[in-house]
Amino acid sequence: MSSKGVISVLVIDDSAHNRRTLSTMLESEPDVRVVDRAADGEEGLKKVVDLKPDVVTLDLEMPKLGGYTFLRLLMRTAPTPVIVISSYSHRSDVFKALELGAFDFIAKPQHPTFEAMEALRVELLEKVRAARHVRPGYRHAAPGARAMAVAGEPPLVVAVGASTGGPPAVQRVLEGLAVEPTPCVLVCQHMPPQFTRAFADRLDRIGPFSVTEARDGDLVQPGHVYIAPGGRHMVVAERGSRLELQTPPPTPVDKYAPCVDRLFVSMAQVLGAKALGVVLTGMGADGAEGARAVHRAGGEVWAQSEETSVVFGMPGEAIATGAVKRVIPLGDIGPALAALARRRR
């Protein structure tokens, strides 16, 4: 357990090299201390119980006790925030881990250049600092009935922005939206390239909507969910009387790609008073400027409530702008959107 503001971390990884590398990164700052390391889930679970660390970093592919089983047992016996360290080759595995209660994940760089490893160090420390303040727990989401896509314009186009804690939150929102007439949902989730495709594929298999990673030129369709591609933006544009999606590359000054602000601003410009943006859990302030733009255009912005957010950074910053019309618990966002879609039919 931490003392005097120092965050205690347990590193679990079956690779001795990875354990050393992560430990060095974590202890490069004075407010973080690695209390111990473990080579597998069984050893890790015992050390969590004994040492009570503030945060755990976890490799999912381990001998004896794998990552999924470790998470299930941990959340039952000693709930602790977990950051999954994932390779690109196992990118689809992280979403199951998030459902089982993991706080967030970090993608190992495909090419461990100095710049890539420094970016990993910065991201790791940022997420460890955020994780110590959350209340971990098992998140279960049951599949819903699949909404039917129909031709024509959707009665409602919803832009959803999320970061840390977002994948399970997005899934929860979609489960409340299997309604007629079917809306269209545009999701901007901070996530690396390739992981967004895996995220879309997983939601498509288990959720109530047809879900794809957005491609440049996609027409906005009712009953469809589009996930912004990692490493690019997703914006709404007009194509004659229809709406289309564009996926421009980021500029050198962009902090996030995809960026919630960029999506919300495009919604405000194209849809005006019909624009609707929802800011879900996440670190930072992405979405706040976009919320202002939607509000100025006469549209609506909703934000996830603090008590249901894994991290209240993004919703809190959006609320602070004065542009948010409704602050809603996560479980009520989907039904509220469904009710709005019915009114707009």
Curated annotation (Swiss-Prot):
InterPro entries: CheB-like, CheB_C, CheY-like_superfamily, Sig_transdc_resp-reg_Me-estase, Sig_transdc_resp-reg_receiver. It is an enzyme of class 3 (hydrolase). The modification 4-aspartylphosphate is found at residue 59. One of its GO terms (cellular component) is cytoplasm. Its EC number is 3.1.1.61, 3.5.1.44. Its main location: cytoplasm. Phosphorylated by CheA. Phosphorylation of the N-terminal regulatory domain activates the methylesterase activity. It is found in: Cytoplasm. The keyword Cytoplasm applies. It comes from the Bacteria. Keywords: Chemotaxis, Cytoplasm, Hydrolase, Phosphoprotein. It catalyses: [protein]-L-glutamate 5-O-methyl ester + H2O = L-glutamyl-[protein] + methanol + H(+); L-glutaminyl-[protein] + H2O = L-glutamyl-[protein] + NH4(+). PROSITE patterns: CHEB, RESPONSE_REGULATORY. The keyword Transferase does not apply. GO terms for molecular function: phosphorelay response regulator activity; protein-glutamate methylesterase activity; protein-glutamine glutaminase activity. SUPFAM superfamilies: CheY-like (SSF52172), Methylesterase CheB, C-terminal domain (SSF52738). Residues 151-344 form the CheB-type methylesterase domain. One of its GO terms (biological process) is chemotaxis. Residues 8-123 form the Response regulatory domain. Belongs to the CheB family. Contains a C-terminal catalytic domain, and an N-terminal region which modulates catalytic activity. Involved in chemotaxis. Part of a chemotaxis signal transduction system that modulates chemotaxis in response to various stimuli. Catalyzes the demethylation of specific methylglutamate residues introduced into the chemoreceptors (methyl-accepting chemotaxis proteins or MCP) by CheR. Also mediates the irreversible deamidation of specific glutamine residues to glutamic acid. This is Protein-glutamate methylesterase/protein-glutamine glutaminase 1.
